């Protein structure tokens, strides 16, 4: 038997009485009163195949079939007596007339089903080709494919050109560490894998392409976490002559189409909420706030200043902050031990302590309540909009520590207390980022986005004298507390780009050596241009309701940037290294 008439998940009541030919894997086999039932699975779903004892040859063969065998089945579609409302094909079954075993299978080291979620991730990644057979993961990749196609079709309709940019590029100091590729032809020299197509897409604007996009593979050698991978995919977009407002409106329209095509959601707002970077940090302690719930940070400096609690006073005297979050109605649900665990959590973000108070009908209760007389207690209650039964949590430190620790605590409590409506998709634009940040350890400024972001022209006069106050013409798209992507207007004038390089610590010679091709391009009539890059893996993760980026990538790396399936990275032969003019110097492990 060759060929296939239908995919398994698409065998419906409309085919009753017809002969079909199906292919797939055995999800399970059951023997019941002489009848053999086989659940046959392909990527569209499962259909029940019935083998009757009167078909003796097929019945004998079916007795030898085990889970994950690959079958070719021919049979007639009939209505099921005992319907299964939990299956799309639950109203029908296929009475087998012929079965051919295309391939047998050993017992799999991991289950092919939801129960695989209880198996260690390392084992699932080692046998990723089996893990990917799971219907839940296959559904995620169907969603990913639909997302990519929707984006590609939308941008094509908007007259964007899809252009591929080089994978072997020049190493430039613009962000994380590069992955390097040695050149055999040019011994001792290296290519870098692109962290993004940033420079090439800007050069395409110089070339007059006007509107460009690419679903691009990118590589960053950085410390990993649940929502990061060393190789990832981004939707890369660049436009010339387009107003920032128009670009943002276009992205809003595109995301609306993605939500409708993938999840059937038609409630995505035509315009997304906007918030400045300063407001996001002030209210949520994060530049990518999850706005699906409250627990906002409250500045209580005016309410606690002078009360006599030395920790608060010392922070304020050293230009620090005292902020609180009001956990409404939870005072009785948090023991001292519970709060100690929260304190351990905030310590990871640099907080030296987590002060707390419980609000009662009589006033304030807790280890620092003695510092707040009736007047100060009332001021604090009013500042935090507190009522009896509320739990107040405080951090006093420098602004970055207050934001990081309370911002993270806010999200932790939001999840643990069930405050987040998981059915919501809250899109948000965060704007007016600072152009640069000063790192005290290095004693230098770093670009918050990248060195090619245009400073706000209103602030250009501050670039040399007060760079920390310069705003960038930059915008991040945030969804449910994740940064979906970042964009900006680009620098397109050589003198501004050179000033930016100088601010970031480049000498004139270093700037020309690293980016001379870009600086020269700016002298040949470069148009104003802007763009954005959206993380496709992260977008799919959110749409699929997943919490791990690895679930959205077919063959992902582990947290240590290794592939358990292929054992990459791995040593190579000395002859290969010699051909590449490379000698390794591995330090002995102590």
Swiss-Prot record:
Biological process per Gene Ontology, one example term: aspartyl-tRNA aminoacylation
InterPro entries: Aa-tRNA-synt_II, aa-tRNA-synth_II, aa-tRNA-synth_II/BPL/LPL, Asp-tRNA-ligase_1, Asp-tRNA-ligase_1_N, Asp/Asn-tRNA-synth_IIb, AspRS_core, GAD-like_sf
Residues the record lists as binding L-aspartate: 174, 220, 449, 490
UniProtKB keywords: Aminoacyl-tRNA synthetase, ATP-binding, Cytoplasm, Ligase, Nucleotide-binding, Protein biosynthesis
Region span, Aspartate: 198-201
Compartments (UniProt record): Cytoplasm
GO molecular function: aspartate-tRNA ligase activity; ATP binding; catalytic activity, acting on a protein; nucleic acid binding; transferase activity
Substrates-to-products reaction catalysed: tRNA(Asp) + L-aspartate + ATP = L-aspartyl-tRNA(Asp) + AMP + diphosphate
Keyword Nucleotide-binding: yes
Matches recorded under PANTHER family: ASPARTATE--TRNA LIGASE, MITOCHONDRIAL (PTHR22594:SF5), ASPARTYL/LYSYL-TRNA SYNTHETASE (PTHR22594)
Sequence similarity: Belongs to the class-II aminoacyl-tRNA synthetase family. Type 1 subfamily.
Function as written in the Swiss-Prot or TrEMBL entry: Catalyzes the attachment of L-aspartate to tRNA(Asp) in a two-step reaction: L-aspartate is first activated by ATP to form Asp-AMP and then transferred to the acceptor end of tRNA(Asp).
Quaternary structure and interacting proteins, as annotated: Homodimer.
HAMAP family in the record: Asp_tRNA_synth_type1
NCBIfam families: aspS_bact (TIGR00459), PRK00476.1 (NF001750)
Protein name: Aspartate--tRNA ligase
């Amino acid at each position: 038997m060759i060929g296939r008439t239908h995919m398994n998940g698409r065998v419906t009541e409309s085919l009753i009485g017809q002969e079909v030919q199906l292919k797939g894997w055995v999800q399970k086999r059951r023997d019941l009163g002489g009848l053999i039932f086989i659940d046959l699975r392909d990527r569209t779903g499962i259909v029940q195949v019935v083998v009757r004892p009167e078909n003796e040859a097929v019945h004998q063969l079916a007795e030898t079939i085990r889970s994950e065998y690959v079958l070719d089945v021919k049979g007639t579609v009939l209505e099921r007596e005992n319907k299964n409302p939990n299956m799309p094909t639950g109203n029908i079954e296929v009475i087998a007339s012929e079965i051919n075993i295309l391939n047998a299978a050993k017992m799999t080291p991991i289950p092919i089903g939801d129960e695989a979620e209880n198996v260690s991730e390392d084992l699932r990644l080692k046998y990723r080709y089996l893990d990917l057979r799971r219907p839940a993961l296959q559904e995620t990749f169907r969603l990913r494919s639909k997302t990519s196609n929707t984006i590609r079709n939308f941008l094509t309709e908007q007259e964007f050109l899809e252009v591929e940019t080089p994978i072997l590029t020049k190493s430039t100091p613009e962000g994380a560490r590069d992955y390097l590729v040695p050149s055999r032809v040019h011994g001792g020299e290296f290519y870098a894998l692109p962290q993004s197509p940033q420079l090439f897409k800007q050069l395409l604007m110089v070339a007059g392409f006007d509107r460009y996009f690419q679903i691009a593979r990118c590589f960053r050698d950085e410390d990993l976490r649940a929502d990061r991978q060393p190789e990832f995919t981004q939707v890369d977009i660049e436009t010339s002559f387009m107003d920032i407002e128009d670009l943002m409106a276009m992205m809003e329209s595109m995301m609306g189409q993605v939500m409708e095509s993938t999840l059937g959601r038609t409630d995505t707002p035509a315009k997304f909420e906007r918030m400045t970077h300063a407001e996001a940090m002030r209210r949520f302690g994060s530049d990518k706030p999850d706005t699906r719930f409250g627990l906002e940070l409250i500045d209580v400096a005016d309410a606690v200043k002078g009360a006599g609690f030395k920790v608060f006073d010392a922070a304020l005297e050293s230009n620090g902050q005292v902020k609180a979050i009001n956990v409404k109605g939870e005072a009785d649900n948090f023991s001292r031990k519970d709060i100690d665990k929260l304190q351990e959590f905030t310590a990871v973000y640099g907080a030296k302590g987590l002060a707390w108070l419980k609000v009662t009908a009589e006033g304030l209760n807790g280890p620092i309540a003695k510092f707040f007389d009736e007047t100060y207690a009332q001021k604090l209650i009013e500042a935090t909009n507190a009522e009896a039964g509320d739990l107040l949590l405080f951090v006093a430190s420098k602004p970055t520590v207050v934001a990081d620790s309370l911002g993270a605590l806010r999200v932790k409590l939001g999840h643990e207390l069930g405050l987040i409506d998981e059915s919501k998709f809250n899109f948000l634009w965060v704007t007016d980022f600072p152009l640069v940040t000063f790192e005290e350890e290095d004693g230098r400024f770093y670009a918050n986005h990248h060195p090619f972001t245009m400073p706000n022209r209103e602030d250009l006069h501050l670039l040399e004298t007060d760079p920390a106050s310069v705003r960038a013409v930059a915008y991040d798209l945030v969804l449910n507390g994740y940064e979906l992507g970042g964009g900006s207007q680009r620098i397109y004038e050589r003198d501004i780009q050179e000033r930016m390089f100088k601010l970031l610590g480049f000498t004139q010679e270093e700037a020309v050596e690293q980016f001379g091709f870009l600086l020269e391009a700016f002298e040949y009539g470069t148009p104003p241009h802007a763009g954005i890059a959206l993380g496709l893996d992260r977008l799919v993760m959110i749409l699929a309701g997943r919490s791990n980026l690895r679930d959205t990538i077919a063959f992902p790396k582990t947290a240590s940037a290794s592939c358990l399936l292929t054992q990459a990275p791995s040593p190579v032969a000395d002859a290969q290294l010699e051909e590449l003019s490379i000698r390794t110097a591995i330090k002995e492990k102590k």
